[in-house]
Amino acid sequence: MKVVFELSGEHPSLSPSEVIHCLKSEGVSYRYMDIFGSFLLVNIEGRADIKKVSQRLALSHLIDIYLFSTKPYLRHLLKKARKTKVDIEGSFRVRCENRSNKKLRSIDLEKKLGGIYADKHDVNLTNPDTEIRLLLSEELWFVGKKLFEVNRSQYEKRKANFRPFFLPISMHPRLARCMVNLSEVKAREKLLDPFCGTGGILIEAGLIGAEVMGSDIERWIAEGCKKNLRYYGIKGFEIENVDVGEIDIFGKVDAVVTDFPYGRASTTKKEPIEKLYKRAFLSISNVLKNRRKLVCAIPSIELIKIGCDYMDLVEVHPFRVHGNLTRYICIFTK
């Protein structure tokens, strides 16, 4: 079964990478096909539970069953649509997503494509049984059937200012969930955040069923993290007030996901940032199981290089936060 992931477009490399790592974490056999702008085409092998993947994703909007594709012209679209059999159950509507540079009226395309199917099926623009998706990229136009919609509004509801305990500088829940997904952690596996802060990463990991552990050098922050985890119904967590050099108390873990201190607004207890990173990478490499992943946000290329002395760097995604502030989302393996 071919499916199209409608990526959010928030980040050109993070969005498709999240999809691929999500598929792996849920044990979905797949064959990567291609990416066209914000549309990722994947061939799913066998019977896979794509719904679980949709429930994990943060940087996608929709997952569609692929029906056909055409050259990016209306005449090609309508010609192919007339020749291609499309199974429509009950009523339907057509929705167009234009991610190309062409100035086209989506509603006009929806009417023209919908007109082909309207002879045999009822149109329902508000609550259809089937939604036909028309996806416009620069290279190709895709037609598919909506399979699942990613619940992106949930992440807005979990922003830091809605939590019982928060600090001014906190990662957005969408990015936190994305990083958790990049780690390929599965439900009931152990995930550690050694710089847990208010618990944003642990909340997202706990909500997908991971067993979460975290530490912070400040006791009051560690206690605040516990309060947030309880608020979101996360069970069985373990939060300790310890230095990153003491995280071996957690034993071996399946994934480490963390937002490293930046040295300015973050607490380093006046320790030089390079020394802290060396100790952190050493400790993380000692607790992480073999062939598993560390996913981390790091503020500079120079600090990424420190990690390369301890683990293998497999992916780097520059992520501009605002102004001149750029984080690098990195995936290391042991």
Describe every region a protein language model picked out.
Residues 88-91, 187-188:
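Phosphate-coordination loops involved in phosphoryl transfer and adenosine-cofactor binding
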Residues 67-72, 122-124, 128:
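Short glycine-rich, low-complexity/disordered patches
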Residues 22, 77-80, 84, 112, ...:
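Residues that form generic nucleotide/phosphate-binding pockets
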Residues 51-85:
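A broadly used, surface-exposed interaction patch
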Residues 91-98, 102-124, 140:
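Long recognition/docking surfaces used for binding and targeting
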Residues 1-59, 80, 99-100, 104, ...:
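Class I S-adenosyl-L-methionine-dependent methyltransferase catalytic core
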Residues 3, 65-67, 86, 315-316:
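Hydrophobic transmembrane signal anchors and adjacent membrane-proximal interface regions, especially
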Residues 83-87, 123-125, 135:
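Short, charge-rich binding segments
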